[in-house]
Amino acid sequence: MRTLSTNHYEIPTMFFRQIYEKGLAHASYMVGCQKSGTVAVIDAKRDVDTYIEIARQENLRITHVLETHIHADFLCGSRELAELTGAEMFLSDEGGAEWAYAFEHNGLRDGHSFMVGNIRFDVWHTPGHTPEHICFLVTDTPASSVPVMFFSGDFVFVGDVGRPDLLERAAGYSGTMVDGARQMFASLQRFRTLPDHIQIHPAHGAGSACGKSLGDVPHTTVGYEKLVNWALLIHNEELFVKTLLDGQPEPPQYFAMMKMLNKELRPLVSAVPKPVLLDPARFRALVDHGAQVVDTRDKSLSTNAAIPNSLWIANNNALSTWAGWMLDYNQEIIILGAKSQFDEICRRLMRIGLDRIVGYVDSTDVWTDAHKPLTHVPWMSVAQLRELRSAENIYVLDVRKATEFADGHVPGAHHIHAGYLRDHLAELPQDRHIAVMCAAGSRSTIACSLLLQHGFTNIYNITGGFDAWNAAGYEVE
């Protein structure tokens, strides 16, 4: 749309596009000016070819690359995008030296403003989720002098706000989460001053680990959040701090790695990895030298016939998160799965910095052709579990989130979150059968593969998980 002057008004020229990545529930944005043909990208994902292609299709030039903060849940593609397009990076200089980016950029502070064509960006410092966090208040100046959009990053979500505990719980910065919660409370008081009509465009949606109750709609308004967002309905600071910190989900362990890589200089990966097909000899040589095999097939296939020591992480929207929980960033990666899915799998891995993909195989034949046996974990129904758990002295291991376990579990079950299982293997019995369950069977499959890696052979995967147990009407603690 081009600007057309009339006697009364000018038609807006703003370009806007949300790019949503379901796996990490991550929203990035392209915001620009069609008249000047320039556009900014906010909180870019790492596979930046998406933005370059959109800009090409829309006859736009990417000139500005923006970030709201140093992200913990994904590896930001700002540097790759700037390298490929010649755009300049505009990043926060708030929060103090400890939270400063270690590479060249245009530093932004509260009250700064800049233009992308005719589109004005005003910078707000909104500490709470992180000390350096900033937001962008956007005005389409040909249309009005009144701001219309607020790009809130991990500050305000639909129905929630960003968690302030990640620096302490995931990155090891002791004593930061209470201070962060108080900063969040103060930042929200300023947020309340915004007009109700302003659209809010956050960096995450439902399913993200960056909050505990994010809504599942793509955007919201200031007025709507004032009505329904729990964080804006609490006016007592002490109650707010307690409520914000209570019940936050377990942060994936890879978050600490993302914090470091997003802040420091690192090697750039400017294209999606394209792994090669491995022949049996090369596959076995890589495995012998420590390569980790990621079995991305459906759990019904991996649990029934798997390559020994492989990790079973199905290619679905949770792949990035569970790969971050389970894989070693210092080891090479081999993908086992359908060839048609490899581009998607590689994108999901590179988005969290897992770049050391050395090849792929599309079947277990590379193992069995050498007359090597496959491994498996038997399934057990909830009816069998109920019948056998007392008579057979079965140890029930529930690998769901702590909040899920607290809401209800099989009587006598033991809880260890699947992501922390590696750190608690010594607590598991070697002389009892272990029945592993999650909500429906996906996380328990991952946990079973980890247990097999560490020598546990007396394990069962519970079909349908706790959902099936509960649906059957069995007793619950």
Predicted regions mapped to residue ranges:
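Hydrophobic, small-residue-rich alpha-helical packing segments that form membrane-like cores
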Residues: 15-19, 38, 78-83, 87-89, ...
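Short, well-ordered beta-to-alpha junction loops that form the rim of enzyme active sites
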Residues: 202-207, 212-213, 257-259, 296-298, ...
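Active-site metal-binding loops of divalent metal-dependent hydrolases
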Residues: 44-45, 70, 94-95, 129-130, ...
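Metallo-beta-lactamase
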Residues: 37, 120, 130-250
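Conserved beta-strand hairpin/beta-sheet module of binuclear metal-dependent hydrolase folds
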Residues: 9-61, 136-138, 143-153, 158-159
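Active-site metal-binding motif and surrounding structural segment of the metallo-beta-lactamase
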Residues: 46-90
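Rhodanese-like catalytic fold shared by cysteine-dependent sulfurtransferases
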Residues: 101-102, 163-165, 177, 224-257, ...
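Active-site neighborhood of phospho(di)ester-bond hydrolases with catalytic His/Asp-centered motifs
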Residues: 41-42, 61-71, 90-93, 125-128, ...
